């Protein structure tokens, strides 16, 4: 094929991609997000994330609470769950009994014990990177970059958890102060989800102004809808599995991790769709991998 013919093919390819982008922007946002979720097999991805959350993040949160409480016999990591979900008696007693007291975890606070859970965080971050790459229609990074970027993302996520917990669970506040603290805790979450595509997506740093808008998806879903839903449905899950004792608490946690996993996949899809609709067409076309949906 001559150079002129190749140039014509490139031009036709670009025109087709611009046409597909224009057509995609005409679809209702909710329908576009649903289509993207199905396109990347979001249900399966969410289930995988839920298992990794249950086996990695929850143990690290428990060990971290125990460490900062001085492994006290009168402290229970279940307190975090109780305060986060606003549980009341008799559910509070069940949760405390299921988690035990902090002194029981003293032997877990070793380099090998903590490092084991941290290492498991790397596969989780690589999974999240794959989800975002698919949702944003980008080619994934090579293995070395995926490991480095995934580790950075995972450490940033743990930092955000600590900061948010410090803000919202730092004291027994009520009324306007509690509302202000809740709003303040949304800021690091917004920053985190705005930076996630930059870390995990190829060419993810393009259109930074529009990434800030995409980051709002994380604020709405991860920091608002999921916590509110947790306070409504988690107590019902615990009550429904009352006869199973500690296993019932574990099953409720696993179920909730499943919803969080789905929420994260939806966050990736919503952020991608928002970015594609608000960023300049040239930026979107230059950044995306040439993938024909379906």
Each language-model region and where it sits:
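Membrane-embedded alpha-helices and immediately adjacent juxtamembrane helical segments
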Residues: 1-294
């Amino acid at each position: 094929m001559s150079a002129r013919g190749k140039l014509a093919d490139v031009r036709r390819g670009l025109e087709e991609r611009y046409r597909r982008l224009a057509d995609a922007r005409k679809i209702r946002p909710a329908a576009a997000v649903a289509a993207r979720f199905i396109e990347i097999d979001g249900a399966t991805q969410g289930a995988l994330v839920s298992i990794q959350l249950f086996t990695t993040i929850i143990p690290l949160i428990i060990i971290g609470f125990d460490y900062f409480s001085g492994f006290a016999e009168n402290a229970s990591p279940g307190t975090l769950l109780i305060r986060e979900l606003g549980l009341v008696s008799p559910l509070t007693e069940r949760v405390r009994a299921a988690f035990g007291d902090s002194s029981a975890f003293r032997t877990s606070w070793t380099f090998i014990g903590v490092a084991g859970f941290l290492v498991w965080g790397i596969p989780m971050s690589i999974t999240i990177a794959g989800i975002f790459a698919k949702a944003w229609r980008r080619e994934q990074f090579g293995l070395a970059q995926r490991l480095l970027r995934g580790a950075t993302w995972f450490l940033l996520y743990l930092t955000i958890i600590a900061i948010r917990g410090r803000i919202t669970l730092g004291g027994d506040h009520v009324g306007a102060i509690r509302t202000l603290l809740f709003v303040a805790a949304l800021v690091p979450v917004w920053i985190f989800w705005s930076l996630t595509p930059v870390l995990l997506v190829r060419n993810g740093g393009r259109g930074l102004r529009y990434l800030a808008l995409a980051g709002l998806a994380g604020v709405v879903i991860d920091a608002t809808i999921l916590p509110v839903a947790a306070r409504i449905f988690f107590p019902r899950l615990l009550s429904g599995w009352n006869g199973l004792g500690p296993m019932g608490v574990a099953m409720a946690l696993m179920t909730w991790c499943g919803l969080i996993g789905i929420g994260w996949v939806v966050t990736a899809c919503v952020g991608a769709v928002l970015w594609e609709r608000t960023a300049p067409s040239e930026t979107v076309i230059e950044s995306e991998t040439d993938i024909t949906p379906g």
